[in-house]
């Protein structure tokens, strides 16, 4: 049967990407339907119960700046908070929260159910409905066809998922949930380049069987941070510590003994690549022979359960091996395993088959987001879902698509890396991937994106009002500091009266220090958020200005637009290899072409000369801007 309503946007999958996609489209006023195998698992944390970290925390802040869900849910669920790289510069400092997975899922569910224009329906999607090369809806296991103007697929690890514990495997999307086999088969029949990836998870352990006295205690940071710009520490639940222990040579000996029963090493998983930056414990042991131990973080999964997530020992080894090696670890000698660790192998599609809006090139109005595009991690998935939701809504309204540049957002770096270079191993975000990371700090994500989001329609008036108030407060406090004169006798080494704004350029002096020198009462200080902005601006102003100048120069040199589509075999002098890569990627400007693997300065010069000679200047409407990406 046909479902009686026509939707603007259908989102397939209720994980982190799906939730952000559905909520973004709904915030923009689209009648949106979220389809999920199980309503009870919306927002479920399938692996590590944590949000944020290096690069990942930046993505969470950007999601929040665009009025997304993840930061707000984490603020309601975070039970252990830390600021990573606190002693380093502001650009690489990152927030990380250990989340109560029960509270997190409940918070996400509440935000989804509160969202206007969003409907949820429980069914397994079995295929997509096409009219020629345009998607018009999806089919389901209940023999119900759902029709929509756009469709976003956020299937996570469920496409053709196989779960391995040793050499034995069973079909599943994650432990306890079925794989989307029929949908995977239907998608493989379409003109998408299909590959396989593998990821894994560690055995879970009963906290009551752990001797924490033999481990190092790791407390959270004080004062407690928040993820959302609208957040408040009063939303946080009770805080608890994590603990640290290590593997040892006995652990490693057992892993080597069973290595021929690890599916990757036995050749059972042949064509799937695992995550480079989150290797299994067997990979660590086999790749790093000289290391006699590896760190393990014992992370509580919830305030209301006894399960512990031992971060650092994800595995595909048989359960017998898991029992043996866990019992060699200090503090885990009597550990009781509640769930075995496992590896999961699943389908993904080459992201080079996507436009920057995350619409597929092969099927009009069909968008992919999350692990289906070759990424790993909740944050990377959520960020893609948000972008796909925005662009699906823009398509519904017949508006041009949007995506951020590399100098605007880590989301821009993520999308550009995927589409320009593709990936064969699970892609995760790091600050090191961003060449303009001084501009892409956690603290200024709202300044980079909130106003743009408001213009696009995905940021609500309440957030925009709060953002405007913050920026007004920053401007007012900055002006006051420019007028505040500090007498020379108030500070050792000061030879003349100096304005506070000048003193702030010194690395050892911050806003609170100059206000104290001026005898300003503490209750008259600006908010912590405002003080942070002023301190960073004062300390890094020269570096930030230099990076803006570098960006402007780069944009000028590489702003040459390229026609899409174009036959690059016409460009005389290009190597066959580069012509083939350009033909596949179809870069929209010289900047994107420059990042294609194997591109040379000589080849870029050829392209620049060729297109300046053979193409007409683009109109202003075609050049794009802060809120314009490519035509959908």
From Swiss-Prot:
GO CC field: cytosol
Cofactors (names): FAD
One function term, GO molecular function aspect: flavin adenine dinucleotide binding
Cell compartment(s), UniProt: Cytoplasm
Binding positions for NAD(+) per the UniProt entry: 274-288
Residues reported in the UniProt entry to bind FAD: 13-18
PROSITE patterns given in the database record: GIDA_1, GIDA_2
Superkingdom classification of source: Bacteria
UniProt entry keywords in alphabetical sequence: Cytoplasm, FAD, Flavoprotein, NAD, tRNA processing
Signal peptide positions (record): none
Keyword Ligase: no
GO terms (BP aspect): tRNA methylation; tRNA wobble uridine modification
SUPFAM superfamilies according to UniProt: FAD/NAD(P)-binding domain
UniProt family annotation: Belongs to the MnmG family.
Function summary: NAD-binding protein involved in the addition of a carboxymethylaminomethyl (cmnm) group at the wobble position (U34) of certain tRNAs, forming tRNA-cmnm(5)s(2)U34.
PANTHER family found in the cross-reference section: GLUCOSE INHIBITED DIVISION PROTEIN A, PROTEIN MTO1 HOMOLOG, MITOCHONDRIAL
Subunit structure: Homodimer. Heterotetramer of two MnmE and two MnmG subunits.
Protein name per its UniProtKB record: tRNA uridine 5-carboxymethylaminomethyl modification enzyme MnmG
Provenance organism: Dichelobacter nodosus (strain VCS1703A)
Lineage: Bacteria, Pseudomonadati, Pseudomonadota, Gammaproteobacteria, Cardiobacteriales
């Amino acid at each position: 049967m046909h479902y009686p309503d026509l939707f603007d946007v259908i989102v397939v999958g209720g994980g982190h990407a799906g939730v952000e996609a559905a909520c973004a489209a709904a915030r923009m006023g689209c009648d949106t339907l979220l389809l999920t195998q199980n309503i009870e698992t919306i927002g479920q944390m399938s692996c590590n119960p944590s949000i944020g970290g290096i690069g990942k925390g930046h993505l969470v802040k950007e999601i929040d700046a665009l009025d997304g869900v993840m930061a707000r849910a984490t603020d309601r669920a975070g039970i252990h908070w830390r600021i990573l790289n606190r002693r380093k510069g502001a650009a690489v400092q990152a927030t990380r929260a250990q989340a109560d997975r029960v509270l997190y899922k409940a918070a996400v569910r509440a935000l989804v159910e509160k969202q206007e224009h969003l409907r949820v329906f429980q069914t397994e999607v079995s295929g997509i409905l096409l009219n020629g090369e345009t998607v018009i809806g999806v089919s389901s296991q209940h023999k119900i066809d759902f029709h929509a103007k756009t469709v976003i697929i956020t299937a996570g690890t469920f496409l053709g998922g196989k779960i391995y514990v040793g050499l034995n495997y069973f079909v599943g999307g994650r432990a306890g949930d079925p794989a989307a086999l029929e949908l995977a088969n239907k998608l493989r029949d379409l003109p998408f380049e299909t590959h396989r990836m593998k990821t894994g998870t560690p055995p879970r352990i009963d906290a009551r069987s752990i001797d924490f006295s033999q481990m190092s205690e790791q407390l959270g940071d004080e004062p407690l941070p928040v993820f959302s710009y609208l957040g408040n520490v009063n939303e946080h639940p009770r805080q608890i510590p994590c603990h640290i222990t290590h593997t040892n040579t006995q652990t490693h000996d057992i892993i080597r003994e069973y290595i021929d029963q690890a599916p990757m090493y036995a050749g059972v998983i042949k064509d799937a690549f695992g995550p480079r930056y989150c290797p299994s414990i067997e990979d660590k042991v086999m790749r790093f022979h000289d290391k006699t131990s590896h760190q393990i973080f014992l992370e509580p999964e919830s305030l209301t359960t006894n399960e512990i997530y031992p971060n650092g020992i994800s595995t595909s080894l048989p359960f017998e091996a898991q029992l043996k090696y866990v019992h060699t670890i200090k503090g885990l000698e009597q550990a009781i395993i509640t769930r075995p660790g496992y590896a999961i192998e699943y389908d993904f599609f080459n992201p080079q088959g996507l436009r920057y809006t995350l619409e597929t090139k092969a099927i009009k109005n069909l968008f992919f987001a999350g692990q289906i595009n070759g990424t790993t991690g909740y944050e990377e998935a959520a960020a893609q879902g948000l972008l796909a939701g925005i662009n699906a809504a823009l398509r519904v309204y017949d508006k041009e698509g949007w995506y951020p540049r590399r100098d605007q957002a880590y989301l821009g770096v993520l999308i550009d890396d995927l589409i320009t270079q593709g990936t064969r191993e699970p892609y995760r975000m790091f600050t090191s991937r961003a060449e303009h990371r001084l501009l892409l700090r956690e603290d200024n994500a709202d300044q980079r994106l909130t106003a743009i989001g408001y213009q696009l329609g995905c940021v609500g008036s309440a957030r925009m009002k709060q953002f405007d108030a913050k920026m007004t407060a920053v401007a007012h406090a900055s002006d006051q500091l420019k007028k505040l004169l500090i007498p020379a006798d108030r500070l050792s080494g000061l030879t003349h009266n100096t304005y506070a704004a000048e003193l702030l350029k010194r690395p050892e002096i911050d806003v609170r220090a100059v206000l104290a020198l001026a005898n300003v009462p503490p209750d008259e200080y600006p908010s912590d958020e405002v003080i942070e902005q002023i301190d960073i601006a004062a300390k890094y102003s020269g570096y930030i200005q230099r990076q803006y100048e570098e960006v402007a120069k780069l944009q000028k040199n590489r702003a040459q637009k390229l026609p899409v589509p174009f036959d690059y075999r016409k460009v005389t002098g290009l190597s066959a290899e580069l012509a083939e890569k350009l033909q596949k990627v179809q870069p929209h400007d010289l900047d994107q072409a420059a990042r294609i693997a194997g591109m040379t300065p000589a080849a870029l010069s050829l392209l620049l000369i060729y297109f300046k000679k053979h193409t007409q200047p683009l109109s202003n409407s075609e050049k794009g801007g802060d809120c314009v990406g490519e035509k959908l």
